């Protein structure tokens, strides 16, 4: 007799803050989501089975905005159980740099390039908090604390 136990575990995801270093003020890229939940968000997505977090981040950037990114650092982890209305996810957020012209692809309806003071006020998921934490880090070198 083999007993199979099934656990309900959070699903790992990655989000990428992509700074365009060949443009003034190092703006970041946001995508307008093609699928629900609709709205503006950081590029990112689910980690595939057998894939490292870093590989997932690079793949998602290529799939969503068509850019080859250079991962600079792992920024922070966001794990509030209600951060994603679809299911419980844990997001590992990376800061990356890129050059060139991003093009909306995959599940991105469109994309926008935003200077720090131009970020739209309402973003999907907890991405508004992520961007706010990133801007604090970018300007004051303060990492977000544990919540």
Q: What residue spans do the PLM features occupy?
A:
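Conserved Nudix-box catalytic region and its N-terminal flanking loop in Nudix hydrolases
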Residues: 24-64
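A short coil-to-beta-strand element that immediately follows conserved catalytic motifs
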Residues: 67-76
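Acidic, metal-coordinating catalytic segment for phosphate/diphosphate chemistry
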Residues: 1-17, 23
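NUDIX/MutT-family hydrolases
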Residues: 93-95, 103-136
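Residue-level preference for beta-strand/loop junctions
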Residues: 10, 38, 86-90
